[in-house]
């Protein structure tokens, strides 16, 4: 049975209560307050729903993750990185990145980044929890992504690309930055061919929970101002 959250409690049900069909649906309801969002990621779940639906909280099994030392950079991507065609920065325009991620896409109906969700993650950015990666070409924003940094874990949320391989350049730059800062895992949530080509793979929900338990409260040395 699906658990419905109330606004006066930040407690989530155990991850083992998540449904098998649809895979990983853990709870519904509640709100997107900064406190609840932080608690959700610490617990191992994330919000994902369409505009007009109640807030839905997910913890899929398996979970798609990328370990920084398993990053795969193809020869063509490595060549592109060496060419320096794109300029990559961190936290220089979080609102523009999340707006670009929320923009309609040819292959999708609507967007799951609602105005309420946008405002919630912008508040997390103001609190120093959510971060953005900007990829520019000749000063124009052509790619990027955003997510949350907590302890030695980074929780990726969404990315976009308006130029060939722009999001891949941003992602690879982020992974290398996180690795240097002591991060041990990047949560990619759901599988995509795009992420698998970069080295992401599936681990069990239980294994993911172990990483949360051991690394959420460990310090990192990441600097987010470019």
UniProtKB/Swiss-Prot annotation:
Top-rank taxon of the source lineage equals: Bacteria
Q: What does the record give as the reaction this protein catalyses?
A: N-terminal L-lysyl-[protein] + L-leucyl-tRNA(Leu) = N-terminal L-leucyl-L-lysyl-[protein] + tRNA(Leu) + H(+); N-terminal L-arginyl-[protein] + L-leucyl-tRNA(Leu) = N-terminal L-leucyl-L-arginyl-[protein] + tRNA(Leu) + H(+); L-phenylalanyl-tRNA(Phe) + an N-terminal L-alpha-aminoacyl-[protein] = an N-terminal L-phenylalanyl-L-alpha-aminoacyl-[protein] + tRNA(Phe)
> What biological-process terms (Gene Ontology) are attached?
protein catabolic process
Which residues are listed as membrane-spanning? none
Q: Which UniProt keywords apply?
A: Acyltransferase, Cytoplasm, Transferase
Q: Name one GO cellular component term.
A: cytoplasm
GO terms of molecular function: leucyl-tRNA--protein transferase activity
Localization, per the record, is: Cytoplasm
- One Pfam family name is Leu_Phe_trans
Its biological function?
Functions in the N-end rule pathway of protein degradation where it conjugates Leu, Phe and, less efficiently, Met from aminoacyl-tRNAs to the N-termini of proteins containing an N-terminal arginine or lysine.
Could you tell me what this protein is called?
Leucyl/phenylalanyl-tRNA--protein transferase
């Amino acid at each position: 049975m699906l658990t419905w959250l109330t606004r006066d409690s930040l407690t989530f049900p155990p991850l083992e209560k998540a449904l098998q069909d649809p895979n990983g649906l853990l709870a519904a309801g509640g709100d997107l307050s900064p406190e609840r969002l932080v608690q959700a990621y610490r617990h191992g779940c994330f919000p994902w729903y369409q505009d007009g639906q109640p807030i839905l909280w997910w913890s899929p099994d398996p979970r798609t993750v990328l370990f920084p030392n398993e990053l795969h950079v193809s020869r063509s991507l490595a060549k592109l990185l060496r060419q320096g065609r794109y300029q990559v920065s961190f936290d220089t325009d979080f609102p523009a990145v999340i707006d670009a991620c929320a923009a309609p896409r040819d292959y999708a109906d609507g967007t799951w980044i609602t105005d309420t969700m946008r405002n919630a993650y912008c508040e997390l950015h103001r609190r120093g929890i959510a971060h953005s990666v900007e990829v520019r070409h000749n000063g124009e924003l052509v790619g990027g992504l955003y997510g949350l940094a907590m302890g030695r874990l980074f929780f990726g949320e969404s990315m976009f690309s308006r130029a060939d391989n722009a999001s891949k350049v941003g992602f690879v730059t982020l992974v290398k930055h996180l690795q240097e800062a002591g991060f041990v895992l990047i949560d990619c949530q759901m599988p995509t061919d795009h992420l698998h080509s970069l080295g992401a793979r599936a681990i069990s929900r239980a294994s993911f929970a172990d990483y949360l338990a051991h690394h959420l409260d460990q310090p990192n040395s990441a600097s987010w101002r470019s």
